[in-house]
């Protein structure tokens, strides 16, 4: 309570004066929806007064001149798998703080499937040493896959009981609709534990309408970020949800989702907020982060006030953290953006946790990553593969086999459909066929629990030769590899195993590009600009193999997600995401045994 007393005394005009004062700016008050002249007094990391702050200024108060500029709250990303950026939290802070993002809401689920709650605790302790804030949602369970795939840690009801008291915990996160539909016992227990701790349920229900939505709403879900059409978003809004607009690096929904405002006449703008879900460094550095979403919304005709609310207070209210962040108000964390022009919305300076963190798009404070635990640096535990392992056997007598290929297209981001193809058979093995745009895909379980490494086929990557592979691949972070040549695929996979994770391109027996991701096999401490350069080189190397997708590695690494229809690929094999079963690529109309082995 000593801190509370200290803030009360400072805010009440006592002897303690403001440590920082932001003076001369025009305040964008997202609560009262006004813009007016006001100064802001900050004591340590908290706002203590707004308006006339003359009595709070002392001889040691640092004055920040904001004359002729606007003051807006720091922005909040309402749903983000931050590890999918491949940046550690320290490096991610370097990427987004200069762009005005001062808070993110994340389940840290990708590091949890690798190292469990201890790994998440390491990440949360790490971010405390930066000006960025992480509000943590305890994943409803991990993995999210159905049927359940193999991961390093299964986040269970016991984990919920053990972590809900963490100060960063704000809810039950990524509550996948299928878990509610199937009455998954672990998830229902997690919700009950959360209810006992007064924590909200945060959703994940793409393409959910009608009776399915009604059933899903019985879980008490408060917010959802997965609307594929404005009609779907409107139905969820009418059902009582806070709706979160997603604009990620790979899926661009903002322009379509916000038609509920610009074309469908929705007035409840305070129930609409922003998230980016999955972003990569090259996209952040080229387009921006939440600042880009604000500009996009205004370009559609949304008012500056409403667009800024969507990036700040609306998300805070949806997550029930508006007493901490989301507005420039007494008692809130001192996260303030200084903006020259609201419509241009370029961030001139960022005050985060009461100190200037960035100016003119650059960090002005030095962020140093922590020493990493040995467990996170040695998380890839599988044995090497051979080219002979990457095969789909065929016992028939015909020279061709009818198979199901998991098809991806840039027109339907995330959605994987079925493509029936006829492939050649040689020596009892079904071969991929580049002339038909069909490649091999395999997922190698990398935690040393099994010898699972099923092989199937994908279509849409258009690889003419070589292979691409990644050990960061939500929701399991098992090694996924796509290729035209089994030998190159084996080299790619084994390179990741030998280096404890990363992303790699191999062609004609040679590693042509490699990004090392040593922390849990999924993230790195390198700076955002260096990461962006690696991403561009990796994607360009994939394009030289023939891939013409806009983000080759992102299209590959989401193939393990079973919460999005119609098909996925996990360490159990091909998943029919609609009927929640494993199927054989040779028998797409019926279930088949998974090609799995127990580890010896």
Swiss-Prot record:
Protein family: Belongs to the metallo-dependent hydrolases superfamily. Adenine deaminase family.
Superkingdom of the source species: Bacteria
KW Manganese (keyword) present: yes
Gene3D superfamilies: Metal-dependent hydrolases, Urease, subunit C, domain 1
CDD domains per UniProt: AdeC
Enzyme type, top EC level: hydrolase
Organism phylogeny: Bacteria, Pseudomonadati, Pseudomonadota, Alphaproteobacteria, Hyphomicrobiales
UniProt xrefs under HAMAP family: Adenine_deamin (MF_01518)
Cofactors: Mn(2+)
Single annotated GO MF: adenine deaminase activity
E.C. number(s) listed in UniProt: 3.5.4.2
Name of this chain's protein: Adenine deaminase 4
InterPro entries for this protein: Adenine_deam, Adenine_deam_C, Amidohydro-rel, Metal-dep_hydrolase_composite, Metal_Hydrolase
GO BP annotations listed: adenine catabolic process
Short name of one Pfam family: Amidohydro_1
Alphabetic keyword roster: Hydrolase, Manganese, Plasmid
Gene, per the UniProt record: ade4
Catalytically driven reaction(s): adenine + H2O + H(+) = hypoxanthine + NH4(+)
